[in-house]
């Protein structure tokens, strides 16, 4: 189908947040904003088109503000953000979580004292034998340790969704002493809903999102459940808890961790915060702003634990390692209710561009309906739109592609957001080819 000549391929890492991938034949250049993340550019495009009903956009805006990470180039950046009407929330060094007025995102990113703006992205939630395989019983007994460890005197923090404050697991083993010290409910429609007393917590009963999700209750039980009236207990069942019901936006999650650490410090207690959530987006090398900020928060008496995830049997990640092959894969969606999808592709080595080809494929006729041909990231516009029609002309597919040479690790990146038109039945219609080489490859 394509002819590849004398190609030198490097390894490519491909992270897939499964949904769908749309390709097309028309190549239209869009405005480029070099100090905005690809995801931020996509959201601004939707704002410009007044596509406020789009679920991708709704998940990243808070009222009239865009939730984002901002890295300043100089200390003057903080005053400039304030002057622009921004709300600085959590700050670690030169990076902060910030609410930026929607009307000011472009102007803020253009300031010389601002180095980079990265819009907040949605994350997803990620066992009665967990204690056994983690050797918790030995820690409880103090086996080969200076003392037993049960969590007593420690704060267990959890940032998650769907929290039931009244659950029996959040009392002690006898079901008498209530162990949740306080909660911040980010999902509440009220500004900063905090509950700081047992009476307030039991009166509130649960977080505002608990009618559709109970993941946080489940996770907190594993981490710190008291085991009242059951043989099953959490890992640190004598600890106290500070919980944050989160919106699942990564900048809000950072704010939640910061809140728990600061409140634990106020109480004079060591703290472990659990994050049983994640996504498939990013370079997976510790250079995204969420990773940097969380890394800066930890230290003596402040630990963060992260779940391994639930994606082992899901095709959400692949890589091209062979020097004599080209990655070719269909990209499908895991949830047919989704109207959009995201694909994030990274070069494995700094300074090495890679090439991509997108096909629109009809399975019934076994034909390629349209193709972009191979294009290289070092020659394509940073912002591009591809469109194509289905064979009968009733459906229009669109993919918005945002590329960058990420300044914080020197690696080329292609981030794609694609729209899934209503009525598409073929779940394997989008065929992706990825290859790297020293010169552009064309098919």
Give the location of each predicted region.
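Polar, glycine-rich mid-to-C-terminal structural blocks
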Residues: 304-390
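Bacterial N-terminal signal peptides that target proteins for export
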Residues: 5-16
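Autoinhibitory N-terminal propeptides
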Residues: 12-13, 26-147, 154-155, 163, ...
């Amino acid at each position: 189908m394509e002819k590849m000549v004398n190609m030198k391929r490097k390894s490519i890492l491909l992270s897939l947040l499964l949904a769908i991938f749309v390709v097309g034949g028309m190549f239209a250049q869009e405005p480029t904003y070099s100090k905005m993340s690809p995801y931020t550019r996509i959201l601004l495009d939707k704002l410009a088109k007044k596509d406020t009903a789009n679920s991708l956009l709704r998940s990243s805006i808070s009222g009239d503000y865009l939730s984002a990470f901002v890295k300043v180039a100089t200390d003057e950046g903080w005053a400039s953000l304030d002057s622009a009407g921004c709300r600085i929330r959590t700050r670690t060094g030169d990076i902060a979580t910030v609410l930026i007025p929607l009307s000011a995102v472009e102007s803020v990113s253009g300031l010389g004292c601002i180095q980079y703006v990265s819009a907040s992205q949605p994350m997803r939630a990620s066992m009665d034998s967990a204690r056994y395989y983690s050797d918790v019983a030995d820690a409880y007994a103090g086996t080969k340790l200076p003392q037993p460890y049960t969590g007593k005197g420690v704060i267990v923090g959890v940032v998650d969704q769907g929290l039931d404050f009244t659950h029996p697991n959040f009392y002690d083993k006898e079901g008498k002493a209530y162990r949740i010290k306080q909660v911040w409910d980010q999902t509440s429609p009220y500004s900063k809903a905090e509950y700081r007393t047992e009476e307030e917590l039991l009166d509130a009963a649960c977080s505002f999102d608990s009618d559709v999700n109970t993941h946080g209750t489940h996770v907190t039980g594993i981490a710190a459940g008291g085991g009242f009236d059951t043989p099953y207990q959490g890992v640190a069942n004598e600890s106290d808890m500070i919980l944050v019901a989160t919106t699942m936006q990564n900048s809000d999650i950072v704010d939640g961790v910061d809140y728990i650490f600061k409140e634990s410090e106020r109480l004079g207690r060591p703290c472990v915060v659990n994050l049983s959530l994640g996504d498939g987006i990013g370079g997976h090398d510790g250079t995204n702003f969420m990773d940097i900020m969380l890394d800066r928060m930890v230290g003596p008496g402040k630990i963060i634990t992260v779940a391994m995830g639930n994606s082992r049997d899901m095709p959400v990640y692949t890589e091209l390692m062979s020097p004599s092959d080209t990655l070719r894969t269909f990209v499908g969606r895991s949830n047919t209710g989704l109207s959009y999808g995201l694909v994030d592709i990274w070069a494995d080595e700094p300074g090495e561009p890679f090439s991509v080809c997108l096909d629109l494929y009809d399975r019934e006729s076994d034909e390629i309906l349209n193709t972009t041909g191979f294009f290289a990231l070092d020659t394509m516009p940073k912002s591009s739109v591809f469109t194509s029609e289905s064979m009968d002309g009733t459906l229009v597919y669109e993919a918005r592609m945002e590329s960058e040479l990420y300044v914080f690790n020197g690696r080329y990146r292609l981030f794609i957001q694609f729209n899934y038109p209503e009525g598409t039945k073929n779940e394997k219609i989008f065929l992706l080819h990825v290859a790297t080489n020293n010169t552009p490859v064309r098919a």
